[in-house]
Swiss-Prot record:
Residues 92-117 have a biased composition (Pro residues). It comes from the Bacteria. GO terms for cellular component: plasma membrane. Belongs to the TrbI/VirB10 family. Its main location: membrane. Residues 86-117 are annotated as: Disordered. It is found in: Cell membrane. InterPro entries: T4SS_VirB10/PtlG, T4SS_VirB10/TraB/TrbI, T4SS_VirB10/TrbI. The chain crosses the membrane at residues 38-56. Induction: Cotranscribed with ptxABCDE. Activated by the two-component regulatory system BvgS/BvgA. NCBIfam families: T4SS_VirB10. This is Type IV secretion system protein PtlG. Keywords: Cell membrane, Membrane, Transmembrane, Transmembrane helix, Transport.
Length: 374
């Protein structure tokens, strides 16, 4: 067990154990120099840190650090954002006052020549149509009704002239201008467009033209609806034509006169219509196909059969001419037969007892019944 040497003042010595090769005074001097070395080392480390910090800050600073601004304490900006203040650009010099450009002077347009007003023409100024000559063709069918309407127009114009119209109105009357008139006596008048129900009494066959009759099946009242002017049982007489065209399905019938049971008669001159008001009367149409084409077909077949039989019965040298002659003869006969029968008109059949209608085409005046009990 070694004992530590004590200091002269009774304390323990600083160096333990003493180096036997170093003198005692050398150990004491070495002990006094050790704190100074530590101090110099700490100062060197601090200076190195300060130098390294300065170098890092100088490298991390932006190139225009001199133009950076520091915001006030209360308006601190978030870190990492740098704002640069650029110098204010000088204001541009004011432009000198320029005189205003004068307004361009445009050439004045030339005035257009005045347009003359259109000539003033009298109303309904048109030429008088040439009068049609009355002939036998006007006495049947639509032509008969046109002639009747023309006569009625002349009578109406004559009545207006008798009433004492002005000179202008007389001028208009001469130009076939219709004037509004007040029809009197509606209790004794049938107006155009009145429908009369009728039952056909005779059969119609259009091979030849002829007459036909029908019986009124329902009372016909006046324009006012207060009086029966055409009673049931009135007989109506009309006529039909035989010129039914190819493809037609209706026959035209013109009713000419009414015969009432009381003995009164009146001219009618109105067309026949079907139950719906369509013009003409429908019926069963026979187009006569067999009569028109049967003879030609038969002759054509006979010609082919004759040619075939002659070709088999004659020899090879002389049979050719005979065959051609027979074929040509049969073809000529077939063409002639077709020309004679192709224009046969069809026939329409309309049975008696069928319900038909009559459409009144002009005003009918029954003033003769005034004051009677008819």
């Amino acid at each position: 067990m070694l004992n530590r040497p004590s200091s002269p003042d009774g304390g323990e010595a600083h160096a333990w154990p003493p180096d036997p090769e170093i003198p005692v005074f050398a150990n004491a001097e070495h002990a006094h120099r050790r704190p100074l070395r530590w101090m110099f080392a700490l100062v060197a480390v601090a200076l190195s840190c300060l130098l390294a910090t300065g170098i890092w800050r100088s490298r991390a600073a932006p190139p225009h650090a001199a133009t950076q601004t520091v915001a006030p304490a209360g308006q601190a900006l978030p870190p990492g954002r740098i704002f640069t203040v650029h110098p204010r650009e000088p204001e541009p010099a004011p432009l000198p006052d320029m005189p205003a450009a004068p307004d361009p002077i445009l050439p004045q347009p030339r005035p257009a020549p005045p347009v003359p007003p259109p000539p003033i023409r009298a109303p309904y100024d048109y030429d008088e149509p040439a009068p049609r000559r009355d002939s036998a063709a006007l006495k049947s069918g639509p032509a008969m009704m046109v002639a009747t309407a023309a006569r009625l127009g002349q009578t109406e114009r004559a009545g207006m002239a008798d009433d004492g119209v002005s000179a202008d109105a007389a001028t208009l009357i001469g130009r076939n201008v219709s004037r509004a008139t007040r029809s009197g006596g509606r209790d004794y008048r049938l107006l155009p467009g009145t429908f009369i129900d009728c039952i056909l009494q005779t059969r119609i066959v259009t091979n030849v033209p002829g007459l036909t009759t029908c019986i009124v099946s329902r009372d016909v009242y006046s324009a006012s609806g207060k009086r029966v002017l055409v009673p049931r049982g009135t007989t109506v007489v009309g006529e039909y034509r035989a010129d039914l065209a190819q493809g037609s399905q209706r026959i035209y019938v013109a009713w000419s006169r009414l015969f009432m049971p009381s003995g009164l008669t009146i001219e009618l001159a109105s067309p026949a219509v079907d139950g719906t008001g369509a013009a003409g009367l429908p019926g069963v149409v026979d187009d006569k196909f067999a009569q028109r084409f049967g003879g030609a077909l038969l002759l054509s077949v006979l010609g082919d059969a004759t040619s075939y039989m002659l070709a088999r019965a004659t020899d090879a040298r002389h049979g050719v001419n005979v065959n051609l002659t027979a074929a040509g003869t049969m073809n000529s006969l077939a063409a002639s037969a077709l020309n004679n029968t192709i224009n046969i008109p069809p026939t329409l059949y309309k049975n008696h007892g069928d319900q038909i209608g009559i459409l009144v085409a002009r005003p009918l005046d029954f003033s003769i019944l005034r004051g009677t009990n008819e």
